[in-house]
């Protein structure tokens, strides 16, 4: 016999992205504050000797409980097809060192499921970074959606685990980790293609790059010479040229080649004021 029933749409079965109640749970001022304080979402987490192992759930306990109750109430009355799942497409961590490159130490960062007592990495979603490798960007991609359930006394969800190894003699902060992600909640779940954890080493920022340009160097030195205010020492019958312009122009600094057809007045373009690290 052919199926005679009706099929509810995805919204009715509630991936619940458009539900006002769920929006209030996820984006209330209290929920946003807890995401920052309990989960370090978008905040810098300092790795210190007294905090050698850090476990950061991707959903605060209070928020987890409210979301689970929302789905359970809908499930109990037959409006939802499950008690809810948590989906995280990607977790991105920016890692920077706060000690010298000579410091011998490393970080082990991985994604875990709080439903696992051993807190083992999910599908090999684990990256190790030596101190001299930093800075770096790390990414994780779970291969399944996590049920919104309680296991023992633990609210089950994904978590970022960071372990600090080595750094003998360094008791303060040796590295800073800033993690970002976007958790989604639905009454339906799926499995996903396995993608290995990503590790991208980043070139350190060259904050002196602007000062290495010839025109910038000349401008900087000229401004410094012109701003010097000191006592004047005069020799008998000798006039002192107090204009520092001639001194700065004698520096062995090559100006950029002039454009074809430009007039001699265009030579001053090479010495236009430029911003050099805020100067």
UniProtKB/Swiss-Prot annotation:
Keywords, ordered alphabetically: Host cell junction, Transport, Viral movement protein
Matching InterPro entries: MPV (IPR000603)
Superkingdom of origin organism: Viruses
Cellular component per GO, a single term: host cell plasmodesma
Region of interest (Disordered), ranges: 247-279
Subcellular location: Host cell junction, Host plasmodesma
Keyword Transport carried by entry: yes
Protein task: Transports viral genome to neighboring plant cells directly through plasmosdesmata, without any budding. The movement protein allows efficient cell to cell propagation, by bypassing the host cell wall barrier. Acts by forming a tubular structure at the host plasmodesmata, enlarging it enough to allow free passage of virion capsids.
This protein's name: Movement protein
